[in-house]
């Protein structure tokens, strides 16, 4: 084996093994208990929505309010990178986007915490949800 091959072969193996060892990072709309955080209208003004939960499974998104009323829609994966995942969204005949990412916080004492964030952007409103990282 030449010196060139002695260097290239281990580098190639490292690259391949790094890809094989990747685990699920949780950046997906599915598999989380999404709870309502806040909402704004298209002008950026806060909306007073009842408490909502959001569930996503197999391309179907369901929003449920505190009275048990539901809205359903569909989503499809559009783009994924290391920091977030973007979906096309249709909810009760409105089209928009859904974005899943991680929000990091630093408190006054310097302590840090993180949570998953789901942002539903529709023409008339944007709704923010959160989910624990431990899920």
Predicted regions and their residues:
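C-terminal motif of bacterial Sec signal peptides marking the signal peptidase cleavage site
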Residues: 16-19
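Bacterial signal peptide processing site
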Residues: 21-23
């Amino acid at each position: 084996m030449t010196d060139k091959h002695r260097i290239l072969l281990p580098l190639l193996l490292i690259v391949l093994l790094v890809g094989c060892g990747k685990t699920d990072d949780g950046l997906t709309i599915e598999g989380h208990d999404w709870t309502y955080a806040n909402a704004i209208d298209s002008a950026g003004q806060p909306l007073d929505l009842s408490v909502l939960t959001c569930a996503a499974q197999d391309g179907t998104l369901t929003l449920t309010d505190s009275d048990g009323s539901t809205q359903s829609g569909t989503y499809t994966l559009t783009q994924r990178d290391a920091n977030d995942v973007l979906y096309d969204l249709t909810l009760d005949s409105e089209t928009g986007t859904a974005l899943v990412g991680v929000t990091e916080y630093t408190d006054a004492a310097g302590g840090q915490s993180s949570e998953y964030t789901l942002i539903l952007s529709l023409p008339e409103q944007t709704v923010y949800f959160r989910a624990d990282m431990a899920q």
